[in-house]
């Protein structure tokens, strides 16, 4: 059985109690194409429980992995702009590896608030591996992007990187969050290239924010001692630092809420899940 492991510098992190008046809190927007960004939101909220959160998922264009870079950039900028018209934003977290690798420059040029992105945790994985073999589990788009290859060249030149690109894992994570069951046989089929290796990865980077939602299932299938690493804790720490060092915070007393881009039976089924995550309601975003 594998072991779940999230951050090379992880210690026992307690929640940071805000010095701000709890009736007036700065707003953090967490954005993803689907529900995978909830794994990032969960880490941020654990560290900063007193903030006002907005979660937006673009279920109309989900998944982003198969979309063009131009489409993603235009889409993300448009959605963030629509939220800005409704809420005073302190920080935006793009909790999607695919969107982060292509849209951050455009977002930072357009908006004045800080924008935090998510990238595969190649650097800590390269430091943690014991056998020199690191697995990258991500979407095909993330695996093939030049940005990911640059991370590998910069931080993991002494390692062998074994990559698996899978859109099916994204769908499985969505199914799980909607209350469905994940088939171990399907996971074994996806992970088959690693399971048959004489020297498989001992450290696996979860390079999509959906994949931590499947950590429980993945550790049952990967070899004993395999470490799973994602970027959640690092993103939470970065967000906490930015909140602390922001000037002229515009605060709100509103409840945390979620937005989607289209409403259907799937989003109806998500409402109780989102409420468990602390969101008072789910609305359709009009752009």
Curated annotation (Swiss-Prot):
One of its GO terms (molecular function) is glutamate racemase activity. Substrate binds at residues 32-33, 64-65, 97-98, 209-210. PROSITE patterns: ASP_GLU_RACEMASE_1 (PS00923), ASP_GLU_RACEMASE_2 (PS00924). Its EC number is 5.1.1.3. The active site is at 96 (proton donor/acceptor), 208 (proton donor/acceptor). It holds the Pfam family Asp_Glu_race. It is an enzyme of class 5 (isomerase). Pathway: Cell wall biogenesis; peptidoglycan biosynthesis. Keywords: Cell shape, Cell wall biogenesis/degradation, Isomerase, Peptidoglycan synthesis. GO terms for biological process: cell wall organization; peptidoglycan biosynthetic process; regulation of cell shape. InterPro entries: Asp/Glu/hydantoin_racemase, Asp/Glu_race, Asp/Glu_racemase_AS_1, Asp/Glu_racemase_AS_2, Glu_race. It catalyses: L-glutamate = D-glutamate. Provides the (R)-glutamate required for cell wall biosynthesis. Belongs to the aspartate/glutamate racemases family. This is Glutamate racemase. The lineage of its organism: Bacteria, Pseudomonadati, Pseudomonadota, Gammaproteobacteria, Enterobacterales. The gene is murI.
């Amino acid at each position: 059985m594998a072991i779940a492991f999230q951050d090379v510098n992880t210690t026992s992190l307690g929640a940071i109690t805000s010095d701000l008046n709890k009736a007036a809190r700065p707003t953090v927007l967490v954005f993803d194409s689907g529900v995978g960004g909830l794994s990032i939101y969960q880490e941020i909220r654990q560290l900063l429980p007193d903030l006002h959160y907005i979660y937006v998922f673009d279920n109309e264009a989900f998944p982003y992995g198969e979309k063009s870079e131009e489409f993603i950039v235009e889409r993300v900028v448009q959605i963030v702009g629509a939220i800005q018209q409704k809420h005073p934003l302190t920080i935006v977290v793009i909790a999607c590896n695919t969107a982060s690798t292509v849209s951050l420059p455009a977002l930072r040029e357009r908006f004045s608030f800080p924008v935090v992105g998510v990238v595969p945790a190649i650097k800590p994985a390269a430091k943690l591996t014991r056998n020199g073999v690191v697995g990258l589990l991500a979407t095909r788009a993330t695996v093939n992007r030049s940005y990911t290859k640059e991370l590998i060249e910069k931080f993991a030149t002494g390692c062998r990187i074994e990559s698996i690109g899978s859109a099916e894992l994204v769908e499985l994570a969505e199914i799980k969050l909607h209350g469905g069951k994940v088939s171990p046989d399907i996971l074994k089929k996806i992970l088959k290239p690693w399971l048959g290796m004489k020297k498989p990865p001992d450290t696996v980077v979860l390079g999509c924010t959906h994949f931590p939602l499947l950590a429980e299932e993945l550790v049952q299938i990967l070899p004993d001692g395999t470490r799973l690493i994602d970027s959640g804790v690092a993103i939470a720490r970065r967000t906490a630092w930015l909140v602390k060092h922001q000037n002229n915070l515009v605060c709100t007393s509103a409840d945390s809420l979620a937005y989607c881009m289209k409403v259907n039976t799937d989003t109806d089924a998500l409402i109780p899940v989102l409420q468990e995550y602390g969101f008072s309601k789910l609305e359709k975003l009009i752009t």
